Amino acid sequence: MYVVEGKAHGSPHRAKAESLEQMALPQPNPWIEPSKSVKLCYTLMHVAEIAGIRDLADGEYKPHDKTLEDGIDRQINYLLDQVGCTQPGFRLLDIGCGYGRLLKKAKARGARAVGVNVSAEQVDYCSDQGLQVYFCTYRDLLGSPEWHGQFDGVIANGSLEHWVQPEDVKAGKMNEIYNESFAIAHKVIDPDAPDTRYVTTALHVKHALDPEDLLMPWYHLPRGSNRRQFSLLHHWFSGYYPVLGQLEACAKPYFSLEKEVDGTLGYKIASEYRMARMRRGLYTNPKLVWGIVKALARHPYTTATLLECYFIEQAWDWQFRGKEPPTTLLRQTWKLNSQASS
């Protein structure tokens, strides 16, 4: 699938720059097939859009906030400030742009904002909003020289949690994949742009998870155990979390860690807002219920796992609970090492 004039379609064409706000970039050359499990994850999560949930990342909340979006907007503004998107004309790449909320905020600042995404549903939604978004993986950019040196900054807001799979860990490729991701961010940034940065948000764990546990059927693991919860998360969410400190090592020689903020509490609050909205939708929105029924008919195992993980065992919210939560959400700002060779 490729983007043609903003829509996900079946033949490659050059994306048309419809205004001065857009960048004349071709559809990236397909190199890596998007993970089927990650694509399915977002196909199923698209059902939540019926309940008005279009923002799946963390937030930063104040006591007076009343909605999910209050904290998410504050978090997005923080990320844009960190990457340097403060002046009109800033060229921004958003890797894993979701439903485009960050792109809209960047455009409101006068930026020329571009997104890449592996979810056809989200790409089409963004395109309908007039956003410049391409259906591809971030790794496709490595083999697309027209994209190299085109941006003043890059953001990956939660997407890197999908980039490594348990099979990659078993094969000893985890650090290689993370290092390559920093090389790609380095390559697409304009070497002549001043003071450039790459900003990421990602869940981390204190100790590496056993990939065999994640690949094992979750229902074979003890109920309530950390092993079962993380296995549930993988079978629905499809990914593998980096260990604290791992990305800093993998960023070399391309980037140096400049700033790190713990956003775990904000993710917990955002997840509680989403849970309340979804539960309310189950009782008040027949379209949401029907969407879940259709998902069960099309993808019974993965949808049932999603329901078990999210509503019954609440593994998603579990990872943020307690005095020492099982995961830590880090917002990290990386400064480009201009002398590094990519």
Segments from the language model and where they lie:
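Conserved Class I S-adenosyl-L-methionine-dependent methyltransferase catalytic core
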Residues: 10-82
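Conserved SAM-binding loop of SAM-dependent methyltransferases across substrates and taxa
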Residues: 99-110
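Conserved SAM-binding strand-loop segment of SAM-dependent methyltransferases
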Residues: 130-141
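A short glycine-rich, Lys/Arg-flanked "PGG" loop and its adjoining helix->strand segment in the class I
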Residues: 172-194
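Conserved beta-strand signature within the Rossmann-like core of class I S-adenosyl-L-methionine
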Residues: 193-203
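Substrate-binding/catalytic lobe of Class I Rossmann-like enzymes that use SAM or dcSAM, i.e.
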Residues: 204-326, 338
